[in-house]
């Protein structure tokens, strides 16, 4: 049975009190039903920076949840107002960090080169970067998906140790839209990514993943997990995601 990595990306959601309520509810759910989580499932949450302190070492150990960051700065330290370094994240027990999310690429003009620099900074500080790639609706409809993905992969993963990273395929047209690539389409692109990288690379799919479609997506040979947005904001739906393959 292959290992699966399921990460919830909260984006800019939840106040401190709301995040604390989620954690309390998740801890209770884990105490009652944690045994339903298969040993092949690794899972985590990427909260906002203001809520990361709630995911303390005791919680991480008690519930086996991983702390994930939504972004980092590529520099180690210095005069970079408002930024967070990989070293800082490592010091609070973060394990993964998302880099190159399409919202960062589009809204903050992050290039493949910047994504590559951030991934290198993560690896150098003992974090595992989850490097996002994906095409726009216009590129998808024009049949340019593979060309776009290939360029992103080549430049974003340049000189990286592929055994120390995760790649998340997130078609931009499926993020937060309710639209989802069919499992077959997602598999086709993830298989393509594997063909131009490594057979052992961990590849996630992201884009409107929900409890209703995760099982079919995770059945695909070249999909090794999910990067989840909205469905990770509620304890019930997140718990459904990480127990989708529990014995019925």
UniProtKB/Swiss-Prot annotation:
This is Triosephosphate isomerase. It comes from Mycoplasmopsis pulmonis (strain UAB CTIP) (Mycoplasma pulmonis). InterPro entries: Aldolase_TIM, TIM_sf, TrioseP_Isoase_bac/euk, Triosephosphate_isomerase, Triosephosphate_isomerase_AS. Homodimer. Its main location: cytoplasm. Keywords: Cytoplasm, Gluconeogenesis, Glycolysis, Isomerase. Pathway: Carbohydrate biosynthesis; gluconeogenesis; Carbohydrate degradation; glycolysis; D-glyceraldehyde 3-phosphate from glycerone phosphate: step 1/1. The active site is at 101 (electrophile), 170 (proton acceptor). It comes from the Bacteria. HAMAP family: TIM_B (MF_00147_B). GO terms for molecular function: triose-phosphate isomerase activity. Involved in the gluconeogenesis. Catalyzes stereospecifically the conversion of dihydroxyacetone phosphate (DHAP) to D-glyceraldehyde-3-phosphate (G3P). The keyword Cytoplasm applies. Its EC number is 5.3.1.1. It is found in: Cytoplasm. It catalyses: D-glyceraldehyde 3-phosphate = dihydroxyacetone phosphate. The gene is tpiA. GO terms for cellular component: cytosol. Disulfide bonds: none annotated.
